[in-house]
């Protein structure tokens, strides 16, 4: 690894953060190779016989940083959650959680590391754009390496299935455990498409039963809904399409025409080009502009804000919104908000997910990362703590551990059925729906080892109709007939000073420019002019890619 200058302290006084203390007493099927049980070992006594010993006789206390620290290991009533108590007792540990928020976690972690006052275990959440900083931290000796995974079969099994996860090994040593995604059965493909009012599509007679629309069918449907106004908004008041976020436009509207528009593309000869310079990227801009001028796209899309989707969808003005990735949790949030505003309507009769083929007659999507967020150990952590923590991770990524993270305590909250499947034993509410007793306080500590997007699809706490919708959407975009734009880890995490400087904020500049050009009187000329001017600034990045990634 290229030597990076050691980080100097940014502050003079160590930051001391007091979090909630969750104390526990002594310890009284994914396709993983073992169940991860490391609770006992056997050692010979002085007679030559063997006897069981408990490797966790000494109570160890960990400090850990996490978002939602105030919820970690607790119930909504503020009482210790039984699942976390069970875990602490199994490994004879206590945790003090140091609080982070989504707005401060980057800067706060930097402060802790630069002042050598970080907790034992750190939530890093290193995105590719911050990978150079991670390498600098490793080079500065701020993290303790994880032990050889050959001695931890469950961790090794998970690690070997990842590609982006391997980027957190430097010179053959793993310095942060990547929280793996449990969606490998879908090849990590992103299930895009639209959240839309299927009842409106039915009302105008253009609903497709499989809810997969051709490009032309979708354009006609949106136009017809606006014209016929099944929501009774009044002439010209129904919104056809909008994106929920500014960064999703135009990628999830017409991005299938040029899937590399916001990034770089490597040609068959190995050379790299900047996405906006591709001829098909101009076609994306022109097509999006045509849809905008024809009134299919919301007139205020160039100025979209975070609340615009909910306000327009819940009030019955919006027909369809782009989806960056279909999840049960995301759909549940949309439905819950909509249902509050529309108590007389049944959401399962009105809201659904649409898949829209590109102009080539095929669905297209992008491959997602195989991990999200990472947990690093402080370089000052003791050998004993490092071993105990790694043992915990080994259990938590096992089949039993996966079920524990998702369901709770075996034979209390779930059990294996005779056929090996998992039977959920959660209590039911007055409506007969099963209720997750640990929904409040599990994520802050469980996210350290793995994500559970895949579990959502079978989580009985969510309505079956939602789970079925998202499963169908994921099946469509993971199908062999769908064009999948692969994620190449070496490119996604490529970093050096010249490249990082050239691409800083570049993607945002592209989608911001496209939004601005929706009011252009000569969009082809204006787009071409901007791309030509910007290309000179981007060229150093292309040079670095051509020199280092062939």
Task: Set out the residue ranges of the language-model regions.
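N-terminal secretory signal peptides that target proteins for export/translocation
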Residues: 1-3
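Conserved N-terminal structural module of periplasmic/extracytoplasmic solute-binding proteins
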Residues: 6-10, 24-217, 252-255, 261-264, ...
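C-terminal motif of bacterial Sec signal peptides marking the signal peptidase cleavage site
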Residues: 19-23
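Conserved small-residue motifs centered on glycine
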Residues: 66-67, 391-516, 521
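Flexible loop/turn segments at secondary-structure boundaries
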Residues: 70-74, 103-107, 128-132, 183-186, ...
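General small-molecule cofactor/ligand-binding pocket signal
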Residues: 94-100, 299-300, 351-354
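Ligand-binding "clamshell"
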Residues: 132-147, 173, 332-362
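Helix-loop-helix "hinge/cap" segment bordering the ligand-binding cleft or interdomain interface
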Residues: 173-248, 266-312, 317, 321-324, ...
């Amino acid at each position: 690894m290229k030597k990076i200058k050691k980080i100097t302290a940014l502050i003079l006084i160590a930051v001391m953060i007091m979090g909630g203390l969750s104390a526990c007493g002594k310890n009284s099927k994914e396709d993983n190779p073992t169940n991860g049980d490391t609770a006992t070992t056997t050692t010979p006594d002085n007679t030559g016989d063997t006897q069981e010993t408990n490797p966790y006789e000494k109570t160890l206390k960990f400090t850990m940083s996490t978002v939602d620290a105030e919820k970690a290991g607790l119930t909504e009533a503020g009482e210790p959650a039984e699942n976390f108590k069970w875990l602490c007792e199994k490994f004879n540990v206590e945790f003090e959680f140091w609080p982070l928020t989504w707005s401060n976690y980057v800067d706060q972690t930097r402060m802790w590391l630069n002042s050598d006052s970080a907790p034992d275990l750190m939530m890093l959440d290193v995105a590719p754009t911050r990978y150079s900083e991670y390498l600098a931290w490793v080079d500065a000796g701020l993290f303790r390496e994880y032990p050889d995974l050959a001695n931890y079969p469950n961790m090794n099994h998970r690690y070997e299935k990842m590609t982006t996860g391997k980027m957190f090994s430097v010179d053959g040593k793993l310095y942060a455990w990547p929280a793996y995604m449990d969606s490998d059965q879908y090849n990590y493909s992103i299930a895009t498409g639209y959240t839309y009012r299927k009842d409106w599509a039915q009302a105008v007679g253009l609903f497709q039963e499989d809810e997969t629309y051709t490009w032309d069918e979708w354009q006609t449907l949106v136009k017809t809904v606006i014209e016929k106004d099944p929501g009774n908004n009044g002439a010209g008041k129904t919104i056809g399409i909008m994106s929920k976020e500014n960064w999703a436009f135009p990628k999830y509207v017409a991005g299938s025409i040029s899937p590399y528009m916001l990034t770089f593309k490597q040609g068959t000869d190995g050379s790299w080009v900047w996405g906006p310079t591709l001829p098909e990227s101009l076609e994306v801009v022109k097509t999006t502009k045509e849809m905008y001028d024809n009134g299919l796209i919301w007139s205020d899309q160039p100025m979209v804000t975070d609340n615009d989707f909910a306000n327009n969808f819940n009030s019955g003005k919006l027909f369809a919104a782009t989806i960056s990735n279909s999840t049960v949790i995301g759909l549940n949030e949309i439905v819950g908000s909509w249902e509050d505003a529309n108590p007389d309507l049944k959401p399962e009769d009105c809201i659904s997910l649409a898949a829209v083929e590109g102009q080539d007659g095929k669905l297209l999507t992008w491959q997602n990362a195989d991990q999200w967020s990472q947990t690093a150990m402080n370089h000052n952590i003791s050998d004993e703590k490092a071993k105990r923590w790694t043992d915990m991770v080994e259990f938590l990524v096992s089949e039993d551990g996966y079920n524990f993270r998702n369901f709770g305590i075996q034979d209390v909250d779930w059990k294996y059925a005779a056929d090996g499947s998992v039977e959920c034993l959660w209590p039911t509410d007055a409506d007969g729906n099963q209720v997750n007793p640990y929904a409040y306080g599990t994520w802050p500590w469980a996210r350290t080892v793995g994500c559970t997007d895949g579990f959502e699809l079978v989580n009985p706490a969510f309505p079956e109709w939602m789970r079925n919708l998202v499963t169908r959407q994921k099946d469509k975009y993971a199908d062999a007939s769908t064009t999948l734009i692969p994620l190449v880890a070496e490119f996604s995490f490529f970093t050096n000073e010249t490249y990082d400087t050239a691409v800083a904020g570049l993607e945002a500049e592209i989608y911001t420019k496209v939004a601005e050009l929706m009011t252009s009187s000569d969009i082809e000329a204006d787009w071409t002019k901007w791309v030509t001017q910007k290309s000179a600034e981007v060229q150093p990045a292309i040079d670095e890619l051509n020199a280092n990634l062939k």
